């Protein structure tokens, strides 16, 4: 019986990998930084602050939202984006644990 790769790794490791993929692009890091400074933004706010097209910003927002790092709330004809602070704290905690374990393995 074949074992799927996802089954070989724990849920926390899968989430850390998903987080890593989500922040692996400089545009996504920029979006997260903008949202940290200005809590609620619509896509157009981000387009005005980044050297990217609306379609590209939308794609990056989709990736961040799929990972759970940001929340999108519908308001009239727009979506308002903000950081998901609960998920960010979880990722921070898991990342710190991972880094600590890597440093202690000499």
Question: For the regions a protein language model found, what residue spans apply to each?
Answer:
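Alpha-helical residues within the helix-turn-helix
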Residues: 48, 65-66
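N-terminal helix-turn-helix DNA-binding core of bacterial DNA-binding proteins
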Residues: 14-53, 75-87
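Residues within the DNA-recognition helix of helix-turn-helix
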Residues: 60
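Amphipathic alpha-helical dimerization/coiled-coil segments
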Residues: 1-16, 36-37, 85-106
